UniProtKB/Swiss-Prot annotation:
This is tRNA N6-adenosine threonylcarbamoyltransferase. It comes from Chlamydia trachomatis serovar D (strain ATCC VR-885 / DSM 19411 / UW-3/Cx). Required for the formation of a threonylcarbamoyl group on adenosine at position 37 (t(6)A37) in tRNAs that read codons beginning with adenine. Is involved in the transfer of the threonylcarbamoyl moiety of threonylcarbamoyl-AMP (TC-AMP) to the N6 group of A37, together with TsaE and TsaB. TsaD likely plays a direct catalytic role in this reaction. GO terms for molecular function: iron ion binding; N(6)-L-threonylcarbamoyladenine synthase activity. Substrate binds at residues 132-136, 165, 178, 277. The keyword Metal-binding applies. Keywords: Acyltransferase, Cytoplasm, Iron, Metal-binding, Transferase, tRNA processing. Pfam families: TsaD. Fe cation binds at residues 109, 113, 302. One of its GO terms (biological process) is tRNA threonylcarbamoyladenosine modification. Its EC number is 2.3.1.234. The lineage of its organism: Bacteria, Pseudomonadati, Chlamydiota, Chlamydiia, Chlamydiales. It catalyses: L-threonylcarbamoyladenylate + adenosine(37) in tRNA = N(6)-L-threonylcarbamoyladenosine(37) in tRNA + AMP + H(+).
Amino acid sequence: MLTLGLESSCDETSCSLVQNGKILANKIASQDIHASYGGVIPELASRAHLQTFPELLTAATQSAGVSLEDIELISVANTPGLIGALSIGVNFAKGLASGLKRPLIGVNHVEAHLYAACMEAPATQFPALGLAISGAHTSLFLMPDATTFLLIGKTRDDAIGETFDKVARFLGLPYPGGQKLEELAREGDADAFAFSPARVSGYDFSFSGLKTAVLYALKGNNSSAKAPFPEVSETQKRNIAASFQKAVFMTIAQKLPDIVKTFSCESLIVGGGVANNSYFRRLLNQICSLPIYFPSSQLCSDNAAMIAGLGERLFCNRTHVSKEVIPCARYQWESACS
């Protein structure tokens, strides 16, 4: 089956062609326009998706060496995300599905991040613990199989990627700051600042306190939002970045062994943009004795290959397929703890 995947949940537009799980083309267009604003502007994101989809679709079909008529299924990210951005993708998908007379399936963007690792590791062991870490999400799932996701825990405030971007801004790094902060942290002393990992009861996470601790480290007692940041040496910036990175990832890592045991998980699947962080990958391999599956770098960021892959799998299994594909900004998962 040849499946077209479409992704537009936030600020990256993507078109991909996947055939029976094999990626033939995966085109991604990032929106640099948001950098000057220090964050994603939803209206600008929607406009960029609208302008980019047609040319990106052409590039994907040419790269894969196929025509539109060869497409057998259209899979689109329809939740969760920015409602305007999702609507652009869903409407574009509906137009194609109607014109080509092809079936259309909606795919959960967060679930697709976890499925991305399964695409590259067909022998993934289940049940698995799924960890989705990105700019907008930090969630834990029990995965009895590759297409079932039961919520175990989530962040109670900021997502981990959002926290990275905010701390990067404190350090004067340009948006998006996550990768730049990781690069800065490589040259720093992770033990220079005693940022304590947040401890939240149960299976949830919290990152707001850690963000505030970094603010105090930079501003001292004058941590008012209006107070200017004092001059900080490059050495101190590197040390703060390294100490923050260690603490923020320990916030997650310290919970995993007990959760794996409680839910009898046989593997750990990690997905999302933050899953590309090399420090976190090393940390997980140190503390977890079970198999760990990460997507390749290209499949960590928002992309349509994961949308096409999961959509194709769901369609072939005839599971979780709704008759109407509707964009939805939020999604409520069934709990694994009920």
